[in-house]
Amino acid sequence: MLYYFYSIFHINIFQYITVRAGIAFFFAFFLTLYLMPKFIRWAMKKSSYQPIYSLAPEHHKKKANTPTMGGVVFIFSALLASLLTVKIHNPYVLGGFLTILGFLAIGVIDDYGKITKRSNQSGLSAKQKFFLQILVAFVVSLFLYEYAHLNSNLYVPFYKYPLLDMKIFGILFWTLVIVATSNAVNLTDGLDGLATVPSIMALTTLAIITYITGNAVLSHYLLLPKIIGVGEVSIIAAAFAGSLIGFLWYNCHPAEVFMGDSGSLTLGAFIGYMAIISKSEVLLILIGFVFVMEALSVIIQVGSFKLRKKRVFLMAPIHHHFEQKNWNESKIIVRFWIIALISNLIALITLKIR
């Protein structure tokens, strides 16, 4: 909307992505700070509490009366801030909104089932959730290929030329990226603030890359692919970063509210979407290294138990492994934040080395 003020009234400052991203960031931050306490009070009245997994470490039982679905609040704040600041007609913006709303719907349905039936196993079944994730991700990927005409080249760090053109198979690859990232962030969201800060870092890194990719001068200088119009999505990322910092105020240890699947599934999907449109699918391994660690620990644990009847970790995802080793929860969280910070800095450094 602010961009159209520039078009109508010729207020030049609103044509700049960086200015609108800054406005979106602070608007979403303050709106989340304002709305979250109201949501927490409402959720407690409605007994919208987070069901605790029966096999979770013993000290998690004290989290049983913590409200969940806080993701709905910070996503609403981010979406409203985005609607006020982006070019709505931009195809990459539309694809981002489609991703956010689709995965938000899946998360809300799942969270609502868990809350109403007071069980962590009573939301969507794993098969139902996976099917819906694939469906939404496929529609988004098809939209990018057919409507946004996003090129299907695959790029890798340290190499300035595309490794290969996936052509129509890019749709399947992009679907995999979105679904995998969505589930990886969801697995990470097991301790207070554990998924929140790495998500802020990943969104910030991807906002920078997306802005560069959409800028003809900067993309040429850094030898990155030039994708006209994609920089507009960095405003949505800035809005999410702002709303997440506002959410962290209440989600830091000891958490007053959890984001729920409505938050984690949506965040992960949007992070995956940003990696796709900025041609950073492979670099996403570094950008979301904490998420990769968490997801791999589950894959290794399940695979090892099925093949060898032995567990590699005391418990998976890996943050629970460290809990079982009697690490303090705050220490685990901060150390994972440090890992996320270092991996994102390395990811940014790779942009210059080509």
From Swiss-Prot:
<keyword id="KW-0131">Cell cycle</keyword>
<keyword id="KW-0132">Cell division</keyword>
<dbReference type="GO" id="GO:0008360">
    <property type="term" value="P:regulation of cell shape"/>
</dbReference>
<protein>
    <recommendedName>
        <fullName>Phospho-N-acetylmuramoyl-pentapeptide-transferase</fullName>
        <ecNumber>2.7.8.13</ecNumber>
    </recommendedName>
</protein>
<feature type="transmembrane region" description="Helical">
    <location>
        <begin position="257"/>
        <end position="277"/>
    </location>
</feature>
<comment type="function">
    <text>Catalyzes the initial step of the lipid cycle reactions in the biosynthesis of the cell wall peptidoglycan: transfers peptidoglycan precursor phospho-MurNAc-pentapeptide from UDP-MurNAc-pentapeptide onto the lipid carrier undecaprenyl phosphate, yielding undecaprenyl-pyrophosphoryl-MurNAc-pentapeptide, known as lipid I.</text>
</comment>
<feature type="transmembrane region" description="Helical">
    <location>
        <begin position="282"/>
        <end position="302"/>
    </location>
</feature>
<dbReference type="GO" id="GO:0009252">
    <property type="term" value="P:peptidoglycan biosynthetic process"/>
</dbReference>
<dbReference type="InterPro" id="IPR003524">
    <property type="entry name" value="PNAcMuramoyl-5peptid_Trfase"/>
</dbReference>
<comment type="pathway">
    <text>Cell wall biogenesis; peptidoglycan biosynthesis.</text>
</comment>
<feature type="transmembrane region" description="Helical">
    <location>
        <begin position="193"/>
        <end position="213"/>
    </location>
</feature>
<dbReference type="GO" id="GO:0051992">
    <property type="term" value="F:UDP-N-acetylmuramoyl-L-alanyl-D-glutamyl-meso-2,6-diaminopimelyl-D-alanyl-D-alanine:undecaprenyl-phosphate transferase activity"/>
</dbReference>
<dbReference type="Pfam" id="PF10555">
    <property type="entry name" value="MraY_sig1"/>
</dbReference>
<feature type="transmembrane region" description="Helical">
    <location>
        <begin position="130"/>
        <end position="150"/>
    </location>
</feature>
<dbReference type="GO" id="GO:0071555">
    <property type="term" value="P:cell wall organization"/>
</dbReference>
<keyword id="KW-1133">Transmembrane helix</keyword>
<keyword id="KW-0997">Cell inner membrane</keyword>
<comment type="similarity">
    <text>Belongs to the glycosyltransferase 4 family. MraY subfamily.</text>
</comment>
<dbReference type="GO" id="GO:0051301">
    <property type="term" value="P:cell division"/>
</dbReference>
<feature type="transmembrane region" description="Helical">
    <location>
        <begin position="331"/>
        <end position="351"/>
    </location>
</feature>
<dbReference type="Pfam" id="PF00953">
    <property type="entry name" value="Glycos_transf_4"/>
</dbReference>
<feature type="transmembrane region" description="Helical">
    <location>
        <begin position="227"/>
        <end position="247"/>
    </location>
</feature>
<keyword id="KW-0808">Transferase</keyword>
<dbReference type="InterPro" id="IPR018480">
    <property type="entry name" value="PNAcMuramoyl-5peptid_Trfase_CS"/>
</dbReference>
<keyword id="KW-0133">Cell shape</keyword>
<keyword id="KW-0812">Transmembrane</keyword>
<feature type="transmembrane region" description="Helical">
    <location>
        <begin position="66"/>
        <end position="86"/>
    </location>
</feature>
<keyword id="KW-0573">Peptidoglycan synthesis</keyword>
<dbReference type="GO" id="GO:0046872">
    <property type="term" value="F:metal ion binding"/>
</dbReference>
<keyword id="KW-0479">Metal-binding</keyword>
<feature type="transmembrane region" description="Helical">
    <location>
        <begin position="168"/>
        <end position="188"/>
    </location>
</feature>
<dbReference type="GO" id="GO:0005886">
    <property type="term" value="C:plasma membrane"/>
</dbReference>
<keyword id="KW-0460">Magnesium</keyword>
<feature type="transmembrane region" description="Helical">
    <location>
        <begin position="88"/>
        <end position="108"/>
    </location>
</feature>
<keyword id="KW-0961">Cell wall biogenesis/degradation</keyword>
<keyword id="KW-0472">Membrane</keyword>
<dbReference type="InterPro" id="IPR000715">
    <property type="entry name" value="Glycosyl_transferase_4"/>
</dbReference>
<feature type="transmembrane region" description="Helical">
    <location>
        <begin position="16"/>
        <end position="36"/>
    </location>
</feature>
<keyword id="KW-1003">Cell membrane</keyword>
<dbReference type="GO" id="GO:0008963">
    <property type="term" value="F:phospho-N-acetylmuramoyl-pentapeptide-transferase activity"/>
</dbReference>
